C-alpha cells in the first residue's frame, strides 16, 4: 500500500460512521461478555459483527504497517492501538470459543506492544494458549519470561533437531530463523549491543519475505508485526532511553541490569515515562511532572536521583512523601533498586522531629525518604546535611490549599528552594492530578516550559452507573454505544409477607434492601472480573459496608487465601498487638475484605497496605486516604457515597485519585468505575445524584490546586476588612504586634488570626536566618527575592481583589513583627530549629530554666521507670500550658497517670482501652505525635545553650513517647522490625547490645532467632513469630551467592565478546557463545559447572591468555 493510499484509507476508516458504529457495538458487547451477562439479555447487534470488525481491525493494521515504515509514528500508533482494541473486544474475553481465537489474540498482543501498550500486550498473552513452538517462544518473550525462553532455545540448539522440530518443513525453517532472531534480541537485552538487535530485525525481514513466497498470510502478518515489535523494543528499551539521560555508560549499565534481573524484569519504559524523561528538562534547576496514577512516576524519580548521584557522588537526595504509608512504599521501591547499585537509601524513622538515630542514618545515606514534617525539622537542625542536599523530589505535589498541613508543606518548599539555589541543586515536583500545571512549573522551575505532562495510562477506563431501583441493580455503561447489564442483581426474598394474629401486616423483605446492600452485591459479583474497591466518604461508613460484604461472602461460601504468607503474618501480628486476638478487622481480612481509613492504627494500616500491594485482596472498602499515593490497584472502583458530612462532598480531584486505582498495570486492560445512584429516593434526590455523577465523571472539573499561603494571606486581608481596619493600619498591626491600633480591635483580630499566623511565623524567622536578614539595611528586603517566585505570588496575579503587591507588603509587615517578637538575632536559631509555632517557642525560651530543672532532677535520680514517668508528667503539664492548638477531645487530667504508665511500659492499647476511654486518641495523637513534637523542640533549644546531656535525655524521651516504650534497647528492637511494643520489651531483656544503629540490631535479633530454633532458647510464641517474620524477610532477598572460580583452557575459535555461557540440557553441560555457533561440551570439572548451570546469565569471561573467570551481568548474584 502506498503512503497516500494509506492516508486516504485511514481517513475513510476514521470518518465512516457505519464502521465506527460496528466498533462501538463490539465494545459495548465486550463489557457484557466480561461481566458474565447471560446471552439472552444481549441486545440485537449487527449481523456478522465479528467478521465485519475483524476486517476493520486488519485494515487498521495495514495502514499502521505503512505508517511505521514511513516513520509517521502518531498515526501508526493510533492504527495499531485501534486494531488491537477491536481484536480484544472480539476475542479476548475469558469464555470466548470462537474459531481462530488464539491467532487473533496473538495478533492483538503484538499490535498492543507495537503501540507501546506493554501492559495490555502482557495481559492478552496471559489468555493466549498455543502448542506451537513459535507461539510459545513469542509469548515467553513478550511476557518477559526470559529464563524459560532461554531454556526453550537451549533445548532447540543443544538437543537433537528431530526431537524439537516441527513436521512441516516450512515451519522448521521458520523456527530456526526465528530462534536465531530471539537469541540476538536476548543478547541485545543482556548487553545493549545494537548490532544484535539489527541482526534480529534482519532475520525477521527474511521471514516476512519467506512467508510471502509461501503464500501464508497468517505467518506473513505475524512476522510483520514481530518486526514492528522489535522496532518498538528499540525505542522503549532501557538501553535506548537511559544512557543519554545519565551520560555515564557504567552507571547506566548498572541501573539497567538492576531492572533487568528483578524477579519481574523491567526492560522498557512506559510511553508516559519516555514522554516525561526529557534530557533537556532534566537540566533545569526545577521541573514538574504530571502523570496519571499507575503510569510510572517512581521510575522518573529513580532516573532523576541517579542523574544527581552520577554527577555528584556525595550528594544527598531527599524524597518527600506526604504520608508515612507512601514513604514506606517509596523506600521499598527505591532501596530495592539503588542498594544493589551501592547506594544507601533510608526512610527516617519516627514522626515529625529529627532524632539522634535519624542524624546517624543521614550521614550514611545517599537518598532519604521523609514526610514534610520530618524534612522541616531536619532542614533546620542540621547544617551539614543542608549543605549536602542536591536534589529534592516532592511527591503528590498537588497537595496545597488552606489546610494547615498543606500550608506548612508549601512553605517548606519555599525554604528548600533557598537551600537548593545556594547549593546549585534541583527541585522536582510529581503529581497525578494537577490541572494548572503551568502555575507549578513557574513556581518550581521558574519557567512555563519546565514541565512535562502525560495523559497516557497502562490501562483504559470505562465509566458506568450502578443504579438501585426497588430491590434491583442495573448497570448502565457509558460509551459511544452505551451498554447495559439489566437486572445485574435481582431481588432475593429474605422474609416473606406476613400477618400477625392481631391483624398487623408486615411487607415482604428483599435483598438488596438499600444502596449499601446493592453496592455489596454488585462488588461481590464483579469479583469475576477482578478485585473491587468500594469508596465511601466517611471513616464511620467503612466497617458498616464491610459487614454487609462479609455476610454475603459467608452466604455464598466465598473464601480467600493470602498468597504472601509473610505479609499476612505481619498483618495478623499487628492486629493482635492493637486489638487483641478477637479482632473484627482481622476477621474481615481473613475473608479477603480490607477495611481502610485514617482511623486505623499506623502499624495496622501500613501492614495492610503492604499486604494489598504485594497480594490480591477481594474487596477493599476505603475512604480518600487510600487515594493519596499508596500504589494499590483494583479492577473495579464502586463509588458508593461522596458525602464527607451534611454540607461537604469529596473533591473532584480526590474522586479521580480514587478512580485512578481502577485498572492495574499487567493485570487489567481496562479499569471500571461505577457510580452508585439510589433511585428509591425522591425525584429531586435522584436528579442531584445524577448531576453529581456527571460532574465527577468529567475530568475537566478537577479543581485547580491553589496556594495555601495565598489563601492564608488573603484571609488575613479579608479579616482586617471585616474588623474595619484600614489597610495601612493592618500592615502596622502585623508589624507591631497589637501596638498600633485600638487595643480591642487588635485583640479581636489576633484572636482569629493567631492560629493562621502560627503557620507562617516560624518559617519567616527561618528564612531570615537563610537570607542573613540581620545584616540587611531593611531586614525584610529579601521577601521580594524569595516570594516573587512563589506559588502564592503567581496565583495572586490572577486575583483582582487581592493583588500580588499586597501579598508582598503583608509578608514584609509580618516579617517585621516576627523579628520584633523573636528579639535579638542570637535567639533566631533556637526558634527556627524548634520547628514549633513562634509564640510557643517564645514561651519555651522564657521557661527554659524551669524545664532544665525537671530534666536535671531526672538525670540525678536513679532513672527508674517511676522517675521517667515523673518527668513525663511535668512535661505533660508544661505542654498543656503552651499557646498552641490543642488536640480536640484530649484534656490532661487525672486518668492520664494510668494511661501514661501503660503507654510507656509497652502495654497493648487494646488492654488500656478496657480501663479508660479515649485511650487511642491520647496514645496515637498526643503521645505519638504532639508530645514528641514539643519535647524535641525543647531538646533543640537546650542543645543550642550547650546542655548536651539534658538535650539527649529529652530526645530519648521524645522517641520513647512516639513508640510507647521506656528504654533505648526496646526502641531499637521495635525500629528494627519487631512492631510489637510488648515483644520489643520482652526481647530487650534477653538481648545485649551497644550499637546505636538499627541494622546491627537486626543481626542480633536474627542470631537470637537461630538460638530459639536450634537451642530452643526461651521465647514467647508471639515473639518467635515476629522474629520468624524478620528472618523470612531477610531470606526473601533476591541475592544468590556463587563462589568466584577461574579456569584455564584454550579454544580454537574467535569469540566476539570473549564470553562463554554455561548451559545445561538434561545431564549434559555446555559452554556456548550466545548464538550457539560455538558449543563446547564440558567433560572435566563437571561438578563445578553443575553448581551454577541453573543460574540465569552466568558465564565465563576470558581474562589474559587462557584464563577464564566465572562472571555474570546479574547484580543479584554475589560472587565470593
Curated annotation (Swiss-Prot):
Extract the Pfam families matched here.
Answer: DEAD (PF00270), Helicase_C (PF00271)
Keywords in alphabetical order, please: Antiviral defense, ATP-binding, Helicase, Hydrolase, Nucleotide-binding
Q: Does the keyword ATP-binding apply?
A: yes
GO terms (molecular function) for this protein are: ATP binding; helicase activity; hydrolase activity; nucleic acid binding
Q: Which PROSITE patterns match?
A: HELICASE_ATP_BIND_1, HELICASE_CTER
CDD domains with a match to the protein in the record: DEXHc_Ski2
Where do we find the motif DEAH box here? 395-398
Is Nucleotide-binding tagged as a keyword? yes
List, for all copies, the residue spans of the domain called Helicase C-terminal. Answer: 521-710
Residue intervals of the Helicase ATP-binding domain: 278-452
List the GO biological process terms. Answer: defense response to virus
Domain of life, source organism? Bacteria
Q: Where does ATP bind?
A: 291-298
Please state what is observed when this gene is inactivated. When this gene is missing the Hachiman system does not confer SpBeta resistance in B.subtilis.
Instruction: Cite the InterPro entries for this sequence.
Output: DEAD/DEAH_box_helicase_dom, Hel308_SKI2-like, Helicase_ATP-bd, Helicase_C-like, P-loop_NTPase
> What exactly does this protein do?
Component of antiviral defense system Hachiman, composed of HamA and HamB. Expression of Hachiman in B.subtilis (strain BEST7003) confers resistance to phages phi105, phi29, phi3T, rho14, SBSphiJ, SpBeta and SPR. Probably a helicase.
Protein family (similarity comment): Belongs to the helicase family.
Q: What is this protein called?
A: Hachiman protein HamB
**Source taxonomy:** Bacteria, Bacillati, Bacillota, Bacilli, Bacillales
Q: Which gene encodes it?
A: hamB
Amino acid at each position: 500500500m502506498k503512503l497516500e493510499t494509506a492516508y486516504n484509507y485511514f481517513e475513510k476508516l476514521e470518518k465512516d460512521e457505519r464502521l465506527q458504529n460496528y466498533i462501538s457495538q463490539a465494545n459495548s458487547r465486550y463489557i457484557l461478555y466480561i461481566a458474565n451477562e447471560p446471552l439472552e439479555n444481549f441486545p440485537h447487534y449487527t449481523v456478522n459483527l465479528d467478521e465485519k470488525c475483524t476486517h476493520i481491525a486488519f485494515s487498521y493494521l495495514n495502514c499502521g504497517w505503512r505508517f511505521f515504515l514511513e516513520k509517521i509514528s502518531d498515526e501508526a500508533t493510533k492504527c495499531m492501538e485501534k486494531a488491537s482494541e477491536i481484536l480484544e473486544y472480539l476475542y479476548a474475553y475469558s469464555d470466548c470459543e470462537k474459531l481462530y481465537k488464539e491467532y487473533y489474540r496473538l495478533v492483538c498482543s503484538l499490535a498492543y506492544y507495537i503501540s507501546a501498550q506493554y501492559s495490555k500486550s502482557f495481559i492478552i498473552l496471559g489468555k493466549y494458549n498455543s502448542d506451537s513452538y513459535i507461539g510459545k517462544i513469542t509469548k515467553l518473550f513478550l511476557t518477559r519470561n526470559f529464563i524459560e525462553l532461554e531454556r526453550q532455545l537451549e533445548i532447540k540448539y543443544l538437543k537433537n533437531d528431530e526431537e524439537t522440530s516441527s513436521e512441516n518443513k516450512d515451519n522448521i525453517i521458520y523456527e530456526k530463523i526465528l530462534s536465531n532472531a530471539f537469541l540476538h534480541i536476548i543478547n541485545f537485552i543482556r548487553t545493549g549491543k545494537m548490532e544484535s538487535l539489527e541482526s534480529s530485525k534482519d532475520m525477521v525481514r527474511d521471514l516476512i519475505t519467506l512467508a510471502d513466497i509461501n503464500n501464508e498470510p497468517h505467518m506473513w502478518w505475524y512476522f510483520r508485526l514481530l518486526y514492528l515489535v522489535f522496532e518498538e523494543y528499540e525505542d522503549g528499551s532501557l538501553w535506548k532511553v537511559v544512557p543519554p539521560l545519565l551520560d555515564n555508560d557504567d552507571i547506566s549499565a548498572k541501573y539497567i541490569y538492576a531492572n533487568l534481573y528483578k524477579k519481574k524484569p523491567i526492560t522498557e519504559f512506559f510511553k508516559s515515562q519516555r514522554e516525561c524523561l526529557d534530557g533537556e528538562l532534566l537540566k533545569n534547576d526545577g521541573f514538574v511532572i504530571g502523570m496519571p496514577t499507575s503510569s510510572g512516576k517512581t521510575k522518573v524519580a529513580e532516573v532523576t536521583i541517579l542523574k544527581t548521584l552520577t554527577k555528584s557522588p556525595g550528594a544527598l537526595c531527599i524524597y518527600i512523601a506526604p504520608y508515612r504509608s507512601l514513604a514506606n512504599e517509596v523506600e521499598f521501591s527505591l532501596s530495592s533498586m539503588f542498594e544493589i547499585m551501592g547506594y544507601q537509601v533510608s526512610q527516617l524513622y519516627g514522626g515529625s522531629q529529627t532524632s539522634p538515630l535519624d542524624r546517624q542514618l543521614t550521614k550514611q545515606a545517599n537518598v532519604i525518604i521523609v514526610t514534610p514534617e520530618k524534612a522541616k525539622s531536619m532542614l533546620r537542625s542540621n547544617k551539614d546535611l543542608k549543605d549536602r542536599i542536591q536534589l529534592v523530589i516532592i511527591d503528590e505535589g498537588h497537595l496545597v490549599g488552606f489546610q494547615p498541613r498543606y500550608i506548612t508543606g508549601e512553605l517548606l518548599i519555599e525554604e528548600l528552594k533557598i537551600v537548593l539555589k545556594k547549593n546549585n541543586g534541583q527541585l522536582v515536583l510529581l503529581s497525578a492530578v494537577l490541572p494548572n500545571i503551568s502555575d507549578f512549573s513557574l513556581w518550581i522551575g521558574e519557567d512555563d516550559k519546565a514541565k512535562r505532562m502525560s495523559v497516557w495510562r497502562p490501562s483504559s477506563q470505562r465509566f458506568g452507573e450502578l443504579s438501585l431501583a426497588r430491590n434491583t441493580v442495573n448497570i448502565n455503561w457509558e460509551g459511544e454505544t452505551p451498554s447495559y447489564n439489566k437486572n445485574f442483581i435481582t431481588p432475593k426474598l429474605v422474609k416473606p409477607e406476613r400477618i400477625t394474629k392481631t391483624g398487623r401486616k408486615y411487607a415482604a423483605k428483599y435483598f438488596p434492601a438499600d444502596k449499601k446492600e446493592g453496592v455489596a452485591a454488585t462488588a461481590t459479583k464483579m469479583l469475576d472480573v477482578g478485585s473491587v474497591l468500594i469508596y465511601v466518604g466517611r471513616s464511620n461508613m467503612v466497617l458498616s459496608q464491610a459487614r454487609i460484604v462479609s455476610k454475603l461472602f459467608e452466604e455464598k461460601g466465598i473464601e480467600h487465601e493470602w498468597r504472601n504468607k509473610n505479609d499476612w503474618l505481619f498483618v495478623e501480628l499487628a492486629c493482635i498487638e492493637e486489638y487483641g486476638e478477637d479482632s473484627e478487622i482481622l476477621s474481615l481480612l481473613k475473608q479477603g475484605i480490607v477495611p481502610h481509613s485514617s482511623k486505623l492504627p499506623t502499624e495496622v494500616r501500613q501492614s495492610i497496605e503492604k499486604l494489598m500491594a504485594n497480594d490480591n485482596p477481594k474487596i477493599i472498602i476505603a475512604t480518600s486516604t487510600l487515594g493519596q499515593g499508596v500504589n494499590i490497584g483494583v479492577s473495579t472502583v464502586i463509588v458508593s457515597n461522596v458525602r464527607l458530612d451534611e454540607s461537604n462532598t469529596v473533591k473532584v480531584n480526590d474522586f479521580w485519585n480514587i478512580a485512578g486505582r481502577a485498572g492495574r498495570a499487567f493485570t487489567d486492560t481496562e479499569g471500571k468505575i461505577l457510580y452508585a445512584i439510589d433511585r428509591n429516593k425522591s425525584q429531586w434526590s435522584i436528579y442531584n445524584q445524577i448531576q453529581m455523577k456527571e460532574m465527577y465523571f468529567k475530568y475537566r472539573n478537577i479543581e485547580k490546586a491553589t496556594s495555601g499561603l495565598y489563601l492564608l494571606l488573603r484571609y488575613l486581608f479579608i479579616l482586617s476588612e471585616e474588623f474595619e481596619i484600614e489597610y495601612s493600619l493592618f500592615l502596622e498591626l502585623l508589624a507591631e504586634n497589637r501596638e498600633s491600633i485600638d487595643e480591642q480591635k487588635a485583640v479581636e483580630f489576633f484572636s482569629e488570626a493567631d492560629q493562621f499566623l502560627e503557620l507562617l511565623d516560624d518559617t519567616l524567622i527561618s528564612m531570615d536566618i537563610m537570607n542573613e536578614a540581620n545584616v540587611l539595611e531593611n531586614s525584610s528586603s529579601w521577601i521580594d527575592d524569595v516570594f516573587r517566585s512563589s506559588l502564592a505570588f503567581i496565583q495572586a496575579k490572577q486575583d483582582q481583589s487581592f493583588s500580588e503587591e499586597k501579598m508582598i507588603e503583608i509578608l514584609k509587615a509580618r516579617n517585621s513583627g516576627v523579628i520584633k517578637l523573636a528579639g535579638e538575632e542570637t535567639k533566631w536559631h533556637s526558634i527556627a530549629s524548634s520547628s514549633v509555632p513562634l509564640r510557643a517557642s517564645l514561651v519555651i525560651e522564657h521557661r527554659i530554666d524551669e524545664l532544665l530543672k525537671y530534666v536535671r532532677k531526672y538525670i540525678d535520680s536513679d532513672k527508674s521507670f517511676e522517675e521517667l514517668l515523673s518527668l513525663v508528667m511535668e512535661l505533660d503539664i508544661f505542654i498543656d500550658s503552651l499557646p498552641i492548638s490543642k488536640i480536640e477531645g484530649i484534656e490532661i487530667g487525672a486518668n492520664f497517670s494510668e494511661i501514661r504508665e501503660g503507654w510507656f511500659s509497652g502495654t497493648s492499647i487494646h488492654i488500656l482501652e478496657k480501663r479508660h476511654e479515649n485511650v487511642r486518641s491520647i496514645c496515637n495523637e498526643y503521645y505519638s505525635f504532639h508530645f514528641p513534637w514539643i519535647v524535641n523542640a525543647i531538646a533543640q533549644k537546650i542543645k543550642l545553650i550547650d546542655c548536651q546531656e539534658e538535650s539527649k535525655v529529652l530526645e530519648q524521651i521524645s522517641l520513647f513517647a512516639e513508640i510507647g516504650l521506656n528504654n533505648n534497647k526496646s526502641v531499637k528492637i521495635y525500629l528494627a522490625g519487631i512492631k510489637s511494643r510488648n515483644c520489643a520489651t520482652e526481647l530487650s531483656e534477653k538481648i545485649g547490645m551497644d550499637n546505636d544503629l538499627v541494622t546491627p540490631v537486626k543481626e542480633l535479633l536474627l542470631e537470637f532467632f537461630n538460638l530459639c530454633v536450634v537451642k530452643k532458647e526461651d521465647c514467647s510464641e508471639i515473639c518467635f513469630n515476629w522474629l520468624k517474620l524478620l528472618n523470612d524477610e531477610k531470606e526473601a532477598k533476591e541475592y544468590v551467592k556463587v563462589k568466584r572460580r577461574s579456569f584455564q583452557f584454550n579454544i580454537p575459535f574467535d569469540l566476539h565478546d570473549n564470553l562463554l555461557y554455561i548451559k545445561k540440557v538434561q545431564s549434559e553441560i555446555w559452554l556456548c557463545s550466545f548464538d550457539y555457533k560455538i558449543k563446547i561440551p564440558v567433560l572435566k570439572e563437571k561438578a563445578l559447572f553443575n553448581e551454577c548451570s541453573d543460574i540465569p546469565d552466568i558465564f565465563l569471561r576470558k581474562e589474559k591468555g587462557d584464563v577464564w573467570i566465572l562472571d555474570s551481568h546479574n547484580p543479584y548474584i554475589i560472587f565470593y
